[in-house]
């Protein structure tokens, strides 16, 4: 998941968005003060810096500024907690959670696509598929 951890060159941010960059630096200062107050050791706090090695770390800013960090699927949340954002989880364990943001067949088919919903009901002989998604396997005979 490191590919999801977006970083921006400090010079670019400073050149294009100087006021935003100043705010980021103030947030960084506040963050480091908070880490000191929480008793986070210096090595860990340095690994968590919002601005590091000439880059603004957007995911770190997001975790710091947010009340919750959602891994969506349970396995992704565990990856975040165990490796990708491990330092952050150690400091803010209460913020990490997972809530799957998926759609349901009832919502997508029955409400958003009534024509397809009608066809499925017609082919299957009832609308039980809206409750029992496995009923859709009966459609394989039409494939």
Residue ranges of predicted features:
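A conserved ligand/cofactor-binding region detector
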Residues: 1-143
């Amino acid at each position: 998941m490191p590919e999801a951890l977006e970083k921006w060159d400090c010079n670019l941010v400073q050149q294009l968005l100087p006021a935003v960059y100043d705010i980021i630096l103030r947030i960084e200062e506040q963050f480091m003060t908070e880490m000191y107050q929480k008793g986070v050791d210096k090595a860990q706090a340095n690994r968590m810096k919002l601005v590091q090695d000439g880059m603004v770390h957007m995911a770190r800013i997001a975790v710091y500024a947010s009340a919750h960090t959602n891994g969506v699927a349970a396995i992704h949340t565990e990856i975040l907690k165990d490796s990708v954002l491990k330092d952050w989880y150690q400091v803010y364990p209460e913020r990490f959670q997972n809530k799957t943001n998926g759609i349901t067949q009832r919502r997508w088919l029955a409400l958003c696509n009534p024509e397809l919903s009608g066809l499925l009901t017609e082919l299957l002989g009832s609308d039980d598929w809206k409750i029992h998604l496995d009923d859709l396997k009966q459609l394989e005979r039409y494939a």
